[in-house]
């Protein structure tokens, strides 16, 4: 394939690893390289990536830096949260949900620039290689895919650094840069590697980059109100913001109160177990609020069906199948369930906790106090329950008459 590639679009962060990949592509494939850097709220200046690419010989017209923050939240994060998606009971899928958008945009740039190949910096051990490549092939099955970590012999940090020095790539460490392998976007930040590779070893406090420790969070709680329309967040404390602005605001509130830290061992799609630590402050608040709203607006059987389907939906995202027909089918069902998910949820934030203290919906609430009151009944006849119970017990009654023992 090396002699067949003419132009390749590289998912480029400007960091050491992808800068080495850039140079390696030039040397090994002797092809033109286009760089694509996505702003999905990782919190870093992206212009240095442009300068780094220029210094490595990339033409100005072959450097693409795109602000995808609103698209990321509106078209990926919000649809996922309509489903209350959680992988293996804890993980809010912060890395998983970002990959489809990056892959789609990268494939679009390939079409725009006439590139015949795409490349990424995911290793051959992880989930991201699957997520990226399923995305590429969904949009253009004719694209060639170059995954350097599956090809080269630079399989140690020492070899990578030696390669960088040999080719004049700056290896100086950014001031304050974490030694952990990290991934960040508007939804979360993740940490892997080093002492975290021992699942018995507790993470150091200085590893966490975003949030206060719950122990150091304010001693006074904070009350907030979130407004939803059709299952999507539209305002915080009455203030309407862009999708990215809303998640940014929730992150600020969550970080302030030590909310959203997570330390888990998860099952990767490729078959191994991996330990990761995550901070998802805004997402943790959003999930709690959305479920609270659904508790008054969603029919019982619809809610239970959603809960049954959610693990499958979450696994599809985790494993890289965002663009699959089965995920889209589930999304259509989920979105139908959100037609009446309109209302307001009141939350109290305090030292790592998110507590629901109120929920209301002016036109869509199914909660009717007249039916569930502990006071005198006016609309419900309690005698009706006897027949309901007898009919539901009919199979037990028949089995008992036949001598069946339980």
Swiss-Prot record:
<protein>
    <recommendedName>
        <fullName>Argininosuccinate synthase</fullName>
        <ecNumber>6.3.4.5</ecNumber>
    </recommendedName>
</protein>
<dbReference type="InterPro" id="IPR018223">
    <property type="entry name" value="Arginosuc_synth_CS"/>
</dbReference>
<keyword id="KW-0547">Nucleotide-binding</keyword>
<dbReference type="InterPro" id="IPR001518">
    <property type="entry name" value="Arginosuc_synth"/>
</dbReference>
<dbReference type="GO" id="GO:0004055">
    <property type="term" value="F:argininosuccinate synthase activity"/>
</dbReference>
<feature type="binding site">
    <location>
        <begin position="11"/>
        <end position="19"/>
    </location>
    <ligand>
        <name>ATP</name>
    </ligand>
</feature>
<keyword id="KW-0963">Cytoplasm</keyword>
<dbReference type="Pfam" id="PF00764">
    <property type="entry name" value="Arginosuc_synth"/>
</dbReference>
<dbReference type="InterPro" id="IPR048268">
    <property type="entry name" value="Arginosuc_syn_C"/>
</dbReference>
<dbReference type="InterPro" id="IPR024074">
    <property type="entry name" value="AS_cat/multimer_dom_body"/>
</dbReference>
<feature type="binding site">
    <location>
        <position position="96"/>
    </location>
    <ligand>
        <name>L-citrulline</name>
    </ligand>
</feature>
<feature type="binding site">
    <location>
        <position position="38"/>
    </location>
    <ligand>
        <name>ATP</name>
    </ligand>
</feature>
<keyword id="KW-0067">ATP-binding</keyword>
<feature type="binding site">
    <location>
        <position position="278"/>
    </location>
    <ligand>
        <name>L-citrulline</name>
    </ligand>
</feature>
<feature type="binding site">
    <location>
        <position position="127"/>
    </location>
    <ligand>
        <name>L-aspartate</name>
    </ligand>
</feature>
<dbReference type="InterPro" id="IPR014729">
    <property type="entry name" value="Rossmann-like_a/b/a_fold"/>
</dbReference>
<dbReference type="GO" id="GO:0005737">
    <property type="term" value="C:cytoplasm"/>
</dbReference>
<comment type="similarity">
    <text>Belongs to the argininosuccinate synthase family. Type 1 subfamily.</text>
</comment>
<feature type="binding site">
    <location>
        <position position="127"/>
    </location>
    <ligand>
        <name>L-citrulline</name>
    </ligand>
</feature>
<feature type="binding site">
    <location>
        <position position="181"/>
    </location>
    <ligand>
        <name>L-citrulline</name>
    </ligand>
</feature>
<dbReference type="InterPro" id="IPR023434">
    <property type="entry name" value="Arginosuc_synth_type_1_subfam"/>
</dbReference>
<feature type="binding site">
    <location>
        <position position="123"/>
    </location>
    <ligand>
        <name>L-aspartate</name>
    </ligand>
</feature>
<comment type="pathway">
    <text>Amino-acid biosynthesis; L-arginine biosynthesis; L-arginine from L-ornithine and carbamoyl phosphate: step 2/3.</text>
</comment>
<feature type="binding site">
    <location>
        <position position="190"/>
    </location>
    <ligand>
        <name>L-citrulline</name>
    </ligand>
</feature>
<feature type="binding site">
    <location>
        <position position="266"/>
    </location>
    <ligand>
        <name>L-citrulline</name>
    </ligand>
</feature>
<keyword id="KW-0028">Amino-acid biosynthesis</keyword>
<dbReference type="Pfam" id="PF20979">
    <property type="entry name" value="Arginosuc_syn_C"/>
</dbReference>
<feature type="binding site">
    <location>
        <position position="128"/>
    </location>
    <ligand>
        <name>L-aspartate</name>
    </ligand>
</feature>
<dbReference type="GO" id="GO:0000050">
    <property type="term" value="P:urea cycle"/>
</dbReference>
<feature type="binding site">
    <location>
        <position position="91"/>
    </location>
    <ligand>
        <name>L-citrulline</name>
    </ligand>
</feature>
<feature type="binding site">
    <location>
        <position position="131"/>
    </location>
    <ligand>
        <name>L-citrulline</name>
    </ligand>
</feature>
<dbReference type="GO" id="GO:0005524">
    <property type="term" value="F:ATP binding"/>
</dbReference>
<keyword id="KW-0055">Arginine biosynthesis</keyword>
<dbReference type="InterPro" id="IPR048267">
    <property type="entry name" value="Arginosuc_syn_N"/>
</dbReference>
<dbReference type="GO" id="GO:0006526">
    <property type="term" value="P:L-arginine biosynthetic process"/>
</dbReference>
<keyword id="KW-0436">Ligase</keyword>
<feature type="binding site">
    <location>
        <position position="121"/>
    </location>
    <ligand>
        <name>ATP</name>
    </ligand>
</feature>
<comment type="subunit">
    <text>Homotetramer.</text>
</comment>
<dbReference type="GO" id="GO:0000053">
    <property type="term" value="P:argininosuccinate metabolic process"/>
</dbReference>
């Amino acid at each position: 394939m090396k002699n067949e590639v003419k132009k390749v679009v590289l998912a480029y962060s400007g960091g050491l690893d992808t800068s080495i990949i850039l140079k390696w592509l030039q040397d090994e494939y002797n092809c033109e390289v286009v760089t694509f850097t996505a702003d999905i709220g990782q919190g870093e200046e992206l212009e240095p990536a442009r300068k780094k690419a220029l210094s490595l010989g990339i033409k100005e017209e072959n450097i693409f830096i795109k602000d995808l923050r609103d698209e990321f939240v509106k078209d990926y994060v919000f649809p996922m949260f309509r489903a209350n998606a959680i992988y293996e009971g804890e993980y809010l899928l912060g890395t998983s949900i970002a990959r489809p958008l990056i892959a789609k945009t990268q494939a679009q740039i390939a079409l725009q620039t006439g590139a015949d190949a795409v490349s990424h910096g995911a290793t051959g051990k992880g989930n991201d290689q699957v997520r990226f490549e399923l995305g590429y092939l969904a949009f253009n099955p004719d694209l060639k895919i170059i995954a350097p970590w599956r090809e080269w012999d630079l399989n140690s940090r020492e070899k990578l650094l030696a390669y960088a020095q040999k080719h004049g790539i700056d290896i100086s460490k950014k001031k304050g840069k974490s030694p952990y392998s990290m991934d960040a976007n508007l939804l979360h930040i993740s940490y892997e590697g080093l002492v975290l590779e021992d699942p018995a070893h507790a993470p150091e406090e200085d590893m966490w980059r975003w949030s206060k420790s719950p122990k150091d969070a304010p001693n006074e709680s904070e009350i907030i109100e979130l407004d939803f329309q059709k299952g999507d967040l539209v305002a915080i404390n009455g203030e309407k913001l862009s999708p990215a602005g809303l998640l940014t605001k929730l992150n600020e509130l969550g970080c302030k109160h030590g909310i959203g830290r997570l330390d888990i061992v998860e099952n990767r799609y490729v078959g191994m177990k991996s330990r990761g630590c995550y901070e998802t402050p805004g997402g943790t608040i959003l999930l709690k609020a959305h479920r609270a709203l659904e508790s008054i607006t969603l029919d019982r059987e619809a809610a239970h069906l959603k809960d049954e389907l959610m693990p499958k939906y979450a696994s599809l995202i985790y494993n890289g199948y965002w663009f699959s027909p089965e995920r889209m089918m589930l999304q259509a069902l989920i979105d139908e369930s959100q037609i009446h998910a309109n209302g307001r949820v009141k939350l109290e934030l305090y030292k790592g906790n998110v507590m629901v203290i109120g929920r209301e919906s002016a036109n869509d609430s199914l909660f009717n106090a007249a039916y569930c009151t502990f006071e005198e009944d006016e609309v419900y006849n309690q005698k009706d329950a006897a027949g309901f119970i007898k009919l539901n017990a009919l199979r037990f009654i028949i089995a008992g008459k036949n001598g069946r023992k339980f």
